[in-house]
C-alpha cells in the first residue's frame, strides 16, 4: 500500500467570483486511486461563505488528476454538497446539462501582479504600449514570466489537462493559456484545475494572478477575456446556414442571460474598443474580433459547420456557469 496525498479542491461561496480552496488528506491505495475510490470529505462552510450556524459542508470528488508537483500526489476536483446529499446553492457544476459531444476551448487571459501592479510596470505611470503581444526578449516579457508560463504548461500536461498553448498578450505582464475539453463538465473542470495550478505555482515566486477583466481601469490598455470556442455534434456534422442564423437569433434574444454569467464588470471591458463588442448589443461576423460571436472562415467554407467563438466571456467568468448557459 502507498500513501497518497489527495488535494481536495473546490469553489467557495463568494460572489460574484468564487475562490479556489484546497486541503490535503492522506489515504493508502495499492496504486493511483480511481475516482470511485475517493471518499467524501467535509469542511467548515462558515469560513467559505457557504454556511451559517450548522456549518458542515461535504466535498464530493468529481474528477481526479495526477499532481506532478508532489510525490504520490493527486488533484481532486470536488462539488460542494449539503449533508443531506443535495447540491449546495453555490454548486454551479451540479446544474450543468452534461453533454460529451459539446466541445469547449477556453482562452484564459490574466495578468501577473507583484507589489500591486502588473509585472514589469514601472512604479509610477505606464510602460510604452506594445510590442508585448506574442513578444520575445527581456524588454517585452521580463526575466520570470516565461519561466512561470512554461512551468505551468508542463504541470498541466503532466496532470493530464488538455492544455493547448500559451502566448504573451497585448499588455505588459499579461498572458494567455488555452484549454480544450470534450464534454461540458470535463472542459470546465480542466480550466478550473489549470487556474488552480497557476495560482499555486506563483506562490513561490511572490507573484499573484489577477483575473479581473479590466484591472487597469478606464485606460487605453486591453482588458482580459476568456474567449470561448464552442461546438456541438449537430453544429459540427449537420450545421447549415438556416440553423446558424436561428442560433444567432436565439443568442440575440437571450443576450442579457449570457452577459449575466460571463463574468463581473464586463461593461468595463465590452465597450466596442480593444477588439470587443458593446456588452448590450449582440453581433456576429466572419473573422470579426469586434463582434460578440466571431465566425471562422473555415465555418463558412464548410457549409456552416464547425465551431464558433463567443468573445464575450471575461477572464473572471465561472466556466461552469458559462457552459451551463451554452
UniProtKB/Swiss-Prot annotation:
Location in or out of the cell: Cytoplasm
Domain of life: Bacteria
The GS catalytic domain, residue ranges: 83-326
GO molecular function: ATP binding; glutamine synthetase activity; metal ion binding
A biological process from GO: glutamine biosynthetic process
Cofactor: Mg(2+)
Major localization class: cytoplasm
Binding site for Mg(2+): 107, 109, 169, 176
Its EC number(s): 6.3.1.2
Residues that coordinate or bind L-glutamate: 275
Induction: Up-regulated by the nitrogen regulatory protein NtrC.
Reactions catalysed according to its record: L-glutamate + NH4(+) + ATP = L-glutamine + ADP + phosphate + H(+)
GO cellular component: cytoplasm
Keywords linked to the UniProt accession: ATP-binding, Cytoplasm, Ligase, Magnesium, Metal-binding, Nitrogen fixation, Nucleotide-binding
Amino acids binding ATP: 164
Ranges where the GS beta-grasp domain occurs: 4-85
UniProt activity-regulation remark: Transferase activity is inhibited by NH(4)Cl.
PROSITE patterns (alphabetical): GLNA_1, GLNA_ATP, GS_BETA_GRASP, GS_CATALYTIC
Listed InterPro entries: Gln_synt_N, Gln_synt_N_sf, Gln_synth/guanido_kin_cat_dom, Gln_synth_cat_dom, Gln_synth_gly_rich_site, Gln_synth_N_conserv_site, Glutamine_Synthetase
Family classification: Belongs to the glutamine synthetase family.
Note: Two forms of glutamine synthetase (GSI and GSII) can be found in this nitrogen fixing bacteria, GSI is a typical prokaryotic glutamine synthetase whereas GSII is similar to the eukaryotic enzyme.
Function of the protein: Catalyzes the ATP-dependent biosynthesis of glutamine from glutamate and ammonia.
Protein's name according to its UniProt entry: Glutamine synthetase
Source organism of this protein record: Rhizobium leguminosarum bv. phaseoli
Amino acid at each position: 500500500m502507498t500513501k497518497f496525498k489527495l488535494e481536495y479542491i473546490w469553489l467557495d461561496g463568494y460572489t460574484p467570483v468564487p475562490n479556489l480552496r484546497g486541503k490535503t488528506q492522506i489515504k493508502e491505495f495499492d496504486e493511483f486511486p480511481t475516482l470511485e475510490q475517493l471518499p467524501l470529505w467535509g469542511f467548515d462552510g462558515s469560513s467559505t461563505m457557504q454556511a451559517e450556524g450548522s456549518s458542515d459542508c461535504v466535498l464530493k470528488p468529481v474528477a481526479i488528476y495526477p499532481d506532478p508537483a508532489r510525490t504520490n500526489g493527486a488533484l481532486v476536483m470536488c462539488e460542494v454538497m449539503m449533508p443531506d446529499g443535495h447540491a449546495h446553492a453555490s454548486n454551479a457544476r451540479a446544474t450543468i446539462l452534461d453533454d460529451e459531444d459539446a466541445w469547449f476551448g477556453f482562452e484564459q487571459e490574466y495578468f501577473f501582479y507583484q507589489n500591486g501592479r502588473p509585472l514589469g510596470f514601472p512604479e509610477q505611470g505606464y510602460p510604452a504600449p506594445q510590442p508585448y503581444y506574442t513578444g520575445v526578449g527581456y524588454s517585452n516579457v521580463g526575466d520570470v514570466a516565461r519561466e512561470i508560463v512554461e512551468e505551468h504548461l508542463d504541470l498541466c500536461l503532466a496532470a493530464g489537462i488538455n492544455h493547448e498553448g500559451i502566448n504573451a498578450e497585448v499588455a505588459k505582464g499579461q498572458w494567455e493559456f488555452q484549454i480544450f475539453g470534450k464534454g461540458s463538465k470535463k472542459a470546465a473542470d480542466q480550466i478550473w484545475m489549470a487556474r488552480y495550478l497557476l495560482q499555486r505555482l506563483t506562490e513561490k515566486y511572490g507573484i499573484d494572478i489577477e483575473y479581473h477583466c479590466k484591472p487597469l481601469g478606464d485606460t487605453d490598455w486591453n482588458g482580459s477575456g476568456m474567449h470561448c470556442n464552442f461546438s456541438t455534434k449537430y453544429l459540427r456534422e449537420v450545421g447549415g446556414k438556416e440553423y446558424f442564423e436561428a442560433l444567432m437569433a436565439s443568442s440575440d434574444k437571450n443576450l442579457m442571460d449570457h452577459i449575466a454569467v460571463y463574468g463581473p464588470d464586463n461593461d468595463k471591458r465590452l465597450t466596442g474598443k480593444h477588439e470587443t463588442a458593446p456588452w448590450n448589443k449582440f453581433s456576429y461576423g466572419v473573422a470579426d474580433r469586434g463582434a460578440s460571436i466571431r465566425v471562422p472562415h473555415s465555418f463558412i467554407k464548410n457549409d456552416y459547420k464547425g465551431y464558433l467563438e463567443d468573445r464575450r466571456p471575461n477572464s473572471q467568468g465561472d466556466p461552469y456557469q458559462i457552459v451551463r448557459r451554452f
